[in-house]
Design a protein with these regions (language model features):
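Short, hydrophobic-biased amphipathic alpha-helical segments
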Residues: 118-132
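A structural signal for well-ordered alpha-helices, especially hydrophobic packing surfaces
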Residues: 70-71, 107, 111-114, 133-137
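Amphipathic alpha-helical interface elements
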Residues: 2-91, 95-98, 128, 135-138
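Alpha-helical initiation/capping and key positions within long helical/coiled-coil segments
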Residues: 58, 102, 121-124
């Protein structure tokens, strides 16, 4: 085998190895991202039944933010939560999809109209966000 051919072969093999290593590291990063989001989701569940209205409101805002991040992750984009929710209609059953939109609208009322949230509303919203975020991250 000639020297130039040997050098070319070695370079091609090294490039292939680098490509494979980068793909492996990327998939590990994806697993870590999912794990972080699911851990955050679990942690937020501790606050949904709080007697403190501000904690419940903050939790709903954070849950919606987590929904947005999970949709960005799924669609590999940086679009708004609302834009990505429109794309997500095929992921969920019709009633679940509507409930998710209702939870998102509740979050908007909290942010834009300073709306209070009852414990029941907070718990129901958490249940919907949890169900949907887990499904998105599968």
């Amino acid at each position: 085998m000639s020297t130039p051919l040997l050098i070319t072969t070695i370079i091609i093999v090294m490039i292939a190895m680098l490509f494979l290593l980068s793909r492996l590291n990327q998939s590990k990063g994806n697993v870590r991202t999912k794990e972080r989001m699911l851990a955050t989701l679990k942690r937020l569940g501790e606050y949904v039944s709080s007697e403190n209205d501000f904690e419940r409101r903050d939790t709903i805002i954070r849950l919606d933010n987590l929904l947005s991040k999970s949709l960005n992750y799924k669609y590999n984009n940086s679009e708004s939560c609302g834009d990505n929710l429109k794309k997500a209609d095929k992921i969920f059953r019709k009633d679940t999809y509507q409930n998710l939109w209702d939870a998102h609208k509740l979050r908007n009322e909290v942010v834009h109209n300073n709306r209070s949230i009852s414990i029941e509303e907070s718990e129901n919203s958490y249940h919907i966000y949890k169900l949907c975020i887990k499904k998105i991250l599968r």
